[in-house]
Amino acid sequence: MSKIVRVGAVQSEPVWLDLEGSVDKTISLIEKAAADGVNVLGFPEVWIPGYPWSMWTSAVINNSHIIHDYMNNSMRKDSPQMKRIQAAVKEAGMVVVLGYSERDGASLYMAQSFIDPSGEIVHHRRKIKPTHIERTIWGEGQAESLTCVIDSPFGKVGGLNCWEHLQPLLRYYEYSQGVQIHIASWPAEFEMPDPKKIAWLYHETGEASYRASQFFAIEGQAFVLVASQILTEANVERNNLTGNPVTKTPGGGFSMIFGPDGKPLCEPVDAGAEAILTADIDLRDIDKPKAFIDVVGHYARPDLLSLLVNPTVDKHVTTMKK
């Protein structure tokens, strides 16, 4: 296993509600990252076909036409579109954690597929609890989604979606899996809007999401790749976001790469800029903060506090045998 790894975090605008266009752009970004020598690349939450922000700003009845399009442009894990992405990853010889809206039957899930340098999906997970209004669109991941970390030639790579970073027990379970490089997949998150126009909470801002990702690095002593979406004015109407006070354009991005002590390892880019942030990391640097804090080792008290995990995958239908 290589100790020095070049990592990349995507900050980019999706090809909204367009599956084929989304796949084309995904492959383009993989090729661009490969040309820059990236070994591990992280994409935002539901990068394909974009995060439908209008569910937060419009009534369900005023949003139904977008959700119908959204369902038809979500990607199946075993599909020709995914095969194209897998081929691009194989050609690049990297590890990719891809966030997308997964269609399985007639249901959608907020998925992350872990694709290794051979182009194989070596792990697939779904957000275990979509947040608030998200539950009107996406279903929940089951026990297989508790596994967050894979072994790779570039280290142990993990990933969570958005507010899964605010699930302390899930974070702890990922730490116990030995994560070294963590992909923090986020949608676009914006600045605090004018309180005279809307009652909004700080925890739903890019700054708060940035800090939550940084805390993961500090608490888990892992490198963290923060991947986020952006929104430009040209796509406001397409997303049914005209006139709302929350989604300021261009904006939404807050991508960053953190070291295992929480230190930023690259320069930030503007919230509305397209970029692949990169950093060369040394996995041996993890030992430095681990010597101070190992929350699943010497800095734990399992005799007093411990985590109980149910790994059983429930089935919708079980056929009994006589």
Curated annotation (Swiss-Prot):
Gene3D superfamilies in UniProt: Carbon-nitrogen hydrolase
This protein's UniProt keywords: Hydrolase
Catalytic activity: a nitrile + 2 H2O = a carboxylate + NH4(+)
Source species, domain of life: Eukaryota
InterPro entries, A to Z: C-N_Hydrolase (IPR003010), C-N_Hydrolase_sf (IPR036526), Nitrilase/CN_hydratase_CS (IPR000132), Nitrilases_CHs (IPR044149)
Glycosyltransferase is among the record's keywords: no
EC top class, as a word: hydrolase
Presence of keyword Lipoprotein: no
Family annotation (SUPFAM superfamilies): Carbon-nitrogen hydrolase
EC numbers for this chain: 3.5.5.1
Temperature dependence: Optimum temperature is 30-35 degrees Celsius.
GO molecular function: hydro-lyase activity; nitrilase activity
Stretches of the chain forming a coiled coil according to its record: none
pH profile of the protein: Optimum pH is 6.5-8.5.
Residue span(s) of domain CN hydrolase: 5-283
Active site per the UniProt annotation: E45 (proton acceptor), K127, C162 (nucleophile)
Known role: Nitrilase that hydrolyzes preferentially 4-cyanopyridine.
Family: Belongs to the carbon-nitrogen hydrolase superfamily. Nitrilase family.
Name of this protein: Nitrilase
Species the sequence originates in: Talaromyces marneffei (strain ATCC 18224 / CBS 334.59 / QM 7333) (Penicillium marneffei)
